[in-house]
Curated annotation (Swiss-Prot):
This is Ribonuclease HII. The gene is rnhB. InterPro entries: RNase_HII (IPR022898), RNase_HII/HIII (IPR001352), RNase_HII/HIII_dom (IPR024567), RNaseH-like_sf (IPR012337), RNaseH_sf (IPR036397). Its cofactor is Mn(2+); Mg(2+). GO terms for cellular component: cytoplasm; ribonuclease H2 complex. HAMAP family: RNase_HII_B.
Length: 253
């Protein structure tokens, strides 16, 4: 009995490139079957390219692994630009066999995808540390130094202690081998994982501040200077989580 096109499409979802059944379907003259095969082949190419890109984002870590450094921590921060809320940093040590292909710079991902990947990273990572510096401290030491403090705090939370650090556009005062990478969150899976942990952690915190301080839209803008946020400042004033040294807040105090 000839299999239905609908059933073949269903089977293709779980078919590997080496499956002998593919040879049988390739002989099927029905247009629907051939179109389904073309779609499957296109998806396989995309998956292969995705895996290749993912593996290339372990190139820097792999260089360290080959030198005997097993515990490599990726470090990244989020929240330098907002007018309100803390700067949050994360440090993540991934295992050599980490296989979550979608991990990349958090800015390239939807909020839903970041939440999904956050859970997978939490599950699979060897260790995760999160550092946080509040707005009042940012005002005292400046945002650049605050980001460094948050990153250092995140690294110091890691257990086991990392043997080397891969850091996105920053150097830390830590006695560990470290590599400074421009756009590191798109070049290293470890930094990409850290960027996701930091971003989701901060977004969830800002959502809670949206409930505590209504009228600014923190749950939507994460403290950035959107129209709603700026109008809230004009109507209500500033909150304890606003950064008083950031324009336009400093201009109205």
């Amino acid at each position: 009995m000839t299999d239905t096109i609908a059933n073949i499409k269903l089977q293709l979802k779980n078919t590997s490139p080496n499956d002998e059944q593919l040879l049988i379907w390739q002989q099927d003259k029905r247009v629907g079957v051939q179109n389904a095969l073309k779609a499957w082949q296109k998806k396989q190419v995309m998956l292969r390219e995705k895996r290749e890109h993912f593996l290339s984002r372990f190139d820097i870590e792999r260089q360290y692994w080959m030198q005997g450094y097993d515990l490599i921590a990726g470090v990244d921060e989020v929240g330098r630009g907002p007018l309100a809320g803390p700067v949050v940093a994360a440090a993540v040590i991934l295992p050599h066999d980490f296989d979550v292909l979608d991990v990349i710079d958090s800015k390239q991902l939807s909020a839903k995808k970041r939440d999904e990947l956050y859970d997978k990273i939490i599950e699979k990572a060897i260790s995760i540390g999160v550092g946080r510096v509040e707005a009042s401290i940012i005002d005292e030491i400046n945002i650049y130094e605050a980001a460094r403090v948050a990153m250092t705090e995140a690294v110091n939370q890691l257990a086991p202690i990392p043997e080397a650090l891969l850091i996105d556009a920053m150097r830390l005062d830590l006695d560990l081998p470290q590599e400074f990478l421009i756009k590191g969150d798109a070049r290293s899976n470890s930094i990409g994982a850290a960027s996701i942990i930091a971003k989701v952690t901060r977004d969830r915190l800002m959502a809670s501040y949206g409930l505590k301080y209504p009228g600014y839209g923190f749950e939507k803008n994460a403290g950035y200077g959107t129209k709603e946020h700026l109008e809230g400042i004009k109507k209500i004033g500033i909150t304890p989580i606003h950064r008083k040294t950031f324009a336009p807040i400093k201009d109205i105090l």
